[in-house]
Amino acid sequence: MKTFTWIALFLAFGVVVLGAYTRLTDAGLGCPDWPGCYGKPIVPQINAIDSGKAWTEMIHRYLAGSLGIFILINFIFSRSKLSFCLFLLVIFQALLGMWTVTKKLHPPIVMAHLLGGMVTMGLLAFIAFKHSFVQQILVSPKLWSTVFFGLVLIGFQIAFGGWVSSNYAALVCPDFPTCLGNLFPNMDWNAFFIPYDTSLNYEGGILNHTARVTIHMVHRFGAYAVVVYWFCLLVFLFRQKQAILIQAGVLVLMALIFQFLLGVLNVFTKLPLFLAVAHNAGAALLLISVIHLNYRLNSRKT
């Protein structure tokens, strides 16, 4: 099952990246119904602009469906609790995908769909590492908890990034590290509470400028917290002079630097599509690298 799981992991990574491309090209409503497109299993003949967005959305659905089949097969053959949880998660992801369309890109649902994709990929990464890497480092429960908390921080930061994307707040601050010349601009904390209104289409965002600034800056401050926390933690891990810790830590460090630089470049270059997609891919790679480090640590004596 090792090779099978790795294939599923790469497929999940592709689904996450293509999902980001779908959001960033405003193709999320390219097909206004679900699971088909205008009532058809493939994109029907429509005007050129709608056709491109519709095909982007449907290819994303086809790829996600293929991943679901892989995960179902994995559950049938492994029968483990983790594979069962993964199978249930994929079913819930399919529902979120449907609601993303039927609820017209309501931000909490869009963010939940993004997080569900990341968690699916993360669980597949953990299973793949479990099949591939036997050697672990015995550490204290305190150190294990500290590294695990770093994983939780990454999860929250990905959620904030999803909130930025789903509320179209990426371009609201054109400078760095300030926002419109202010390090601490005016904030509107209602930006994190968006009730659902059946009469609204949320494509393009409905929040005012101050609310979007709030979302953007919270994501930035979250990035600072993640970088500082992980830099201090990695320095400590490197000082342990354990080869496995150093190798796993270097992967995290590279992914962290890469992701932070992509975030800054996206601000200065006005969010070109390839950099925006790369920023989402970078978040996925950072998550995988941190899960790898967590897996390599064992706080229980065997």
Show the residue positions of the predicted features.
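A juxtamembrane structural motif centered on a specific transmembrane helix
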Residues: 126-143, 288-302
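N-terminal signal-anchor transmembrane alpha helix
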Residues: 2-28, 152-164
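Extracytosolic (periplasmic/ER-lumenal) interhelical loops and adjacent juxtamembrane/interface segments
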Residues: 24-58, 170-212
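Membrane-interface loop-to-helix entry segments
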Residues: 54-72, 107-122, 214-232, 276-285
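Hydrophobic alpha-helical transmembrane segments of polytopic
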Residues: 4-12, 63, 67, 82, ...
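Aromatic-anchored segments of alpha-helical transmembrane domains
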Residues: 16-17, 89-98, 154-159, 254-264
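Membrane-interface helix-loop-helix junctions at transmembrane boundaries of multi-pass membrane enzymes
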Residues: 76-84, 140-142, 234-252
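Interfacial helix-loop-helix junctions of multi-pass membrane proteins
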Residues: 22-31, 94-114, 164-175, 212, ...
